[in-house]
Amino acid sequence: MSKILVIGAGAWGTALANVLAKKKNKVYVWARNSIIVSEINNKSSNKKYFKDLQLSKKLKAITGKIDTKEFDFIFYVLPASQFENFSQSYLANQKIKDFIICSKGLSESGKLLSEIATKSLNITKIFILSGPSFAKEVITGMPTALSLASNNQKPLQTSALFKDTNIRIYYSNNIKTLEVLGVVKNIYAIGAGILDAMKLGENARASFITRCASEMQFMLKQSNLNDQKILSLAGIGDLVLTCSSTKSRNFSFGKKFIFMQSAKNLSKNKTTIEGLNSIMTIKKVLNLNLKDLPILTSIINVIKGKSVKNEVNNLLRRKFKYE
């Protein structure tokens, strides 16, 4: 029997913890909010995120100090933009066995989470869990497939946690590739939401997603990463899902964006928009040449205040090229 800690009692953290708790594991979910902790422990519910759903009675919640040596597996599911502050406050100077990063985005200082974890934390093994996964569908038992990446060997022990659940795991051997895909697809999802709000049609949506996938593949190649992973669950799978549904926070942000005066005003809400947090720093992180990434460039321009219609026209008027 494994002892598991899921850090973060938001929608995704709660869903993940609930799936893991249905097996013969001792599962704890960590939350800052003492009200949520009490509700999970006393009522087996988290109505802030799942109003009409009962959680597994085996799932327990904790808050405050974390003693990492108590746990065989630790899943990080708080926003990526809180990772450095959280890890320094709660995880530093402790030994961690298996650490699974489930957040898609860049840290406060604009870095990949695995890079920070490797340098600043005492971790035996680091993994990335990524792919198309809306929390509501996962927690209600709908089939979901995810990529689990490790730089060392097949993550057999970690993947075994999901055996006989509604989550099917596929192995990947490149952590950074999966992380980059997770960061970038959130940015493109903002663009997809903007297009949807402009009612440009299904043809435009299909073309947009296809060309975004092409740009993502180019980024991987430019960064000396495995560009074939664009065909993975963490690549095209997550991109299609995130660019097609209002369940996606980044897509919804894009839909609302053109009706607001600025990204600053819209981002005042309490929902984490990882794509917005990453959009201004991704170029530096991957050392990108934006000349070869016209869609990404246009999304950045729109967020900075340029006309959406002008950016769409600029994309359509570009010189024809081979696919």
Predicted regions and their residues:
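NAD(P)+-binding Rossmann beta1-loop-alpha1 motif at the extreme N-terminus of oxidoreductases
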Residues: 1-53, 60-63
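Structural beta-sheet core signal
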Residues: 6, 29, 99-101, 128, ...
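Rossmann-like NAD(P)(H) cofactor-binding subdomain of soluble oxidoreductases
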Residues: 55-57, 61-143, 158-160
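Rossmann-fold dinucleotide-binding core
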Residues: 106-201
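Active-site-proximal catalytic alpha-helix in oxidoreductases
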Residues: 142-148, 176-220, 232-252
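NAD(P)-dependent Rossmann-like dehydrogenase/reductase catalytic/cofactor-binding core
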Residues: 192, 221-231, 239-323
